[in-house]
């Protein structure tokens, strides 16, 4: 999805430098795999080996009320169908887990239709073309886009999937993170909406997550003073010690509101909003005149059984003449080459450190997605299928 950019082919030496930066950025002690007992939930066992001509996929069984549970999805296996003219078959190697996945299984209006009962769970992914009857895709080509929770995806000529040039020495998972839609999301929010100026104060909620960690580092590269909000002392230390944030607020601490006030003595000029709820109210109350709010997500309400209440401090946007703008990354694919070129350059220069959490095993998908809402991941959460 726009990952096939100038940054995707940075050249041998540059690729090695980018790869080295990303490798040291992976948080090994917070990388959850199927073999790691610290993984945030019970592992799924007993599926066994499967035929190469079969396709395992997770279908939506029922819409959850609140948290995703064991009855939300069902594992289904089918024969890989024969391709028709104009189709290609992709082997899915990596699957992206994102808060928006939770929104897509609600039966409510959104920017994409909800996943239907009995349909393959929608998700971004990265894979390789293994068969093709269309000139759009060639065998051996890497592709990125909406591949879904399945091991093989049949792609039509109109599929929301694009080729991506994976540079030698760089993990393909990077193209689902900082060098993919995650990076583009952060870049649009900072460059087009937040527009931080040197010396301004930028607050990023869910700052240790996939988008927030990149957004904060982009703002820091612009010369802003960056305050990150994260859950727990370990994540807060990560923000200040590894990512270069100027201050961090632990939203799990009893005194988080006092921490926010202390970290923003001159008010807040830019809010990169990923969470909503009480955190957003506290941020809105500290906005400066002319502040900009980039509304990227509202993860605090995605598992809510009932609609969450609206912001209580909304009136301060009026008083401070602030601007609030929501945005969806799907509207900005055309900006991907520009964004990826800049982000790759910042990684190479040591000014941006990508983070990722890797879960190994296709069967872990229904459990792994809850890591997003339990605060068990750092940076981009991806599942390695094979």
Pin down the residues of each PLM region:
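Short, glycine/polar-rich helix-capping loops at beta-to-alpha or helix-loop-helix junctions
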Residues: 150-151, 231-239, 309-314
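Short amphipathic alpha-helix with an adjacent loop that forms part of the alpha/beta core around
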Residues: 256-265
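Glycine-rich phosphate-binding loop and adjacent beta-alpha segment
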Residues: 278-352, 385-386
